[in-house]
Amino acid sequence: MKTREQLEATGNKILNSVRTELYLSMRFMGPALGSLGFAMDLSTRTVGTDAVYIRFNPTYLLQTYIERPEILNRTYMHMLMHCLFRHMFSAKQHEDAQLWDLCCDIAVESVVDSMDYPTILRVTSDFRQEWYEKLEKEVSVLTAEKLYQYFMLRKRDPYLEESLRQEFLLCDHSFWQRMEKEPPQEQNKNQPPVPQENPQTVSYTHLTLPTN
């Protein structure tokens, strides 16, 4: 039976491998990819972020890495987008937390789906494509805030919303509700930084992305 230290080391190794694969495919994302530390957290059954760490259940990481490694690439990018759009910092401002979670997931997945990179490629289901087309017509720009307003103003359909959750959910948002304030802007020391090729960057809290 593995010790806690061994499990944490395995999880860190997997996430470092995922991060490296993403970096080799999307070097412009280097600063952002290096902005999150890794922390084992057995309060989650999967993986999530609090905008400082990617918090993971090692069993989930190991099983997914063996069976469907491409899902981890996608999930890592999904979590980075949540941080970029600062979704976790607005979570407590919305009355319906589950709906806010759903809208955040739709918003970030629409962005990731628009990124043409094999490492994060996912075949778009008919159901997903149908809803993208519907929302682009009725909401236009798919931000979490606009999507939340859209769903709040229409007749609520719990069955539909659950189907959408199953389609767009990739990470555990429970860490968002535990956050008290924004994290300090500092380099996490849990792993070495990703090399940065372009010094011209713009900062989004603790995330940085190239300006060109």
Ranges and model annotations:
Residues 36-38, 129-131, 209:
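Short amphipathic alpha-helical surface micro-motifs
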Residues 96-197:
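Internal, well-ordered alpha/beta segment that forms a basic, Gly-enriched binding/recognition surface
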Residues 1-118:
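Basic/hydrophobic alpha-helical interface regions
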Residues 205-211:
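Conserved small/polar residues in nucleotide/adenosyl-binding loops
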